[in-house]
Amino acid sequence: MAEHAPRRCCLGWDFSTQQVKVVAVDAELNVFYEESVHFDRDLPEFGTQGGVHVHKDGLTVTSPVLMWVQALDIILEKMKASGFDFSQVLALSGAGQQHGSIYWKAGSQQALTSLSPDLPLHQQLQDCFSISDCPVWMDSSSTTQCRQLEAAMGGAQALSCLTGSRAYERFTGNQIAKIYQQNPEAYSHTERISLVSSFAASLFLGSYSPIDYSDGSGMNLLQIQDKVWSQACLGACAPHLEEKLGPPVPSCSVVGAISSYYVQRYGFPPGCKVVAFTGDNPASLAGMRLEEGDIAVSLGTSDTLFLWLQEPMPALEGHIFCNPVDSQHYMALLCFKNGSLMREKIRDESASRSWSDFSKALQSTEMGNGGNLGFYFDVMEITPEIIGRHRFNTENHKVAAFPGDVEVRALIEGQFMAKRIHAEGLGYRVMSKTKILATGGASHNRDILQVLADVFGAPVYVIDTANSACVGSAYRAFHGLAGGTDVPFSEVVKLAPNPRLAATPSPGASQRRWVGVSTTKLVSASDAQHRGSNLGRRVAGAMVRKCGTMLEDTRVLLKQSSWPKPAANLDIIKTPETLS
C-alpha cells in the first residue's frame, strides 16, 4: 500500500528464510506501509524451494547470497514505484534468520564503499563473495565440528556455560569450522564473515557492519557474560577468525549513517541512521515488547518459548542469548517439537475432531486433573529428548489410557508444565509483574490459555505478531535513535498497541504443586522409555547429577504449598546427550 503524505518514520527489515520484508512505522508507532519479496516466487532463477537449496546428502542446506542482494534491489524499486517517501526515514534496523553466515572476499570492502547509484546492488556485488551459496540455520552437516568444539572446551556443559548453548550444527562457529576444514582456499580468501543480520546491515551501511551481541550469541563463539569473542572457541574453529569477525557491539548501537548510494538512488536523507541488525528471534522479542519477568509462548506446529532473564543458568537444552533491548539482561529460547499437531491428534482421538468439544473437556475437568497427567511425544521431542505417550494417575502409576476429557486436560497441562520446568531450568522465575504473551494458532482458544495462566500463575495476553521481527526492528531503530543503552526500551515503545488480556489464573492456581508433580512424572516417563538400556542408565545418572539449583527451587516451592510432600525421586530430566 502506498503512503504519499509526509510521515516521519523508521524502517524495520526482515531477511528471513523465504522472503525479505519491510515495514514502515511512524512516530506514534503505527505500521503504515509494508512490502515483501518472496524468493521462490519473485526470484525463480535461483531455483530455491522454501528459499533454500537442500543438497544431495540431505544435511547440507544453503541459500544463494546474491538472491538476498537482488531481493533488496527489487523491494526498494517496488517501494519507489509505489511512491514511498524515503526522505522521511529517520533510521532503519533489521533482522536476519539466525546462524547463517556470509563470506566476503578480500577487496569487498572497497566495492561496498564505492557503489554507483546508476546500477542495482546485485550487479556490483556479484564478485564479492568467496562462497556463493552460504549455510543457513536448516543445515545439519557439521556434527563432526560440534563434537570437536565441545571436546576442546571441556564438554557440552562447559561450552553452554560460556556461550549460552551447547554445540549445535546450525550454529555459526561450527559452520565456519566445517568450511575451513573442507574449503580452506575459500576461507583464506575471506576478509570478513557476517551473519545474515550484519550482512544485511552492511548493504545499507556501505561498509562492514559489526555483529551485535544478541545475534552473536547464536554462534557458539561469544562469551555471553563478558560480551567478547571466546579466544578458546575461536581457536578451536579456525585460524585468524577474530579479525574476520570484527568486534561485536551492543544490539542498540547506531553503526553509522546510510550509504550515499541510497541517498542518490532512492532519496534517503544523508542523516538516516543504521542501527545494528540482529537475529529474527531477538527482533521478535523486541516486537512483542517483552519486559523483565515476561514470557512469550508461540503455540504453533512447534511450540517456542521466549524468556526474559536477568540471571541465566545455561543448560544442555535451550539457548541463552544476550538481550537485544537491554544489554545487561538475557533472553532464552526453548523449542518443543510436539506442538499443534499433537494437540490436533488428541482432539481427533478424544474430542470428536472438534475444537468445541476439546474446549468442553477442559471446562468439565478440574485444575490439576485429579492428579492425572500425561506427556505426549508422537515425534522425538527436542526438550527433553524422548518419544511416546506417557500417562500417570494420581498414585504416579503409569496407565495405558485416560477417559477422553481427562486425556485432553492431561495433554494441555502436561505441555505447559513441561514448558515451565524447562524455563525454570534456564533461570526463569515467575514474578508478581509477569505477563505471558501467547501467539500462534492455539492462542485463539481461551480454554487452552486458561490452563496456561493456571500453570504459570500469571495473566495471559494475546498479541498480533504477524510481522513481529519487522516491527521489532523498527522499534529498535527508534530505540537506537533515542540513545540506546541510555534509554529504557519500554519508554521508547510505550505508545505501541497494547496486548489484549485473555486469561487470568484461577483462584488457588499459584498454590498448586504444578512443578513437583510434573517433574516426577516426566522423570518416570523417561525411565520407563529407557529402562534397562545403557541410555536409560545415562539418563538416570543425568537426573541425579544435573538437577542443581532447579531441583532445590522446586523443593522450596513444594514446601510452601499445602499439597503432599514430593516423592523421593524428584529430579529433573535432562537430554540423553548430557553424558556424551
Swiss-Prot record:
CC annotations in GO: cytosol
Enzyme class: transferase
UniProt xrefs under SUPFAM superfamilies: Actin-like ATPase domain
The organism's place on the tree of life at top rank: Eukaryota
InterPro entries linked to this entry: ATPase_NBD, Carb_kinase_FGGY, D-XK_euk, FGGY_C, FGGY_N
UniProt keyword annotations, A-Z: ATP-binding, Carbohydrate metabolism, Kinase, Nucleotide-binding, Transferase, Xylose metabolism
Gene3D superfamilies per the UniProt record, alphabetical: 3.30.420.40
Function per UniProt: Phosphorylates D-xylulose to produce D-xylulose 5-phosphate, a molecule that may play an important role in the regulation of glucose metabolism and lipogenesis.
Protein's name in the database: Xylulose kinase
Organism whose genome encodes this protein: Pongo abelii
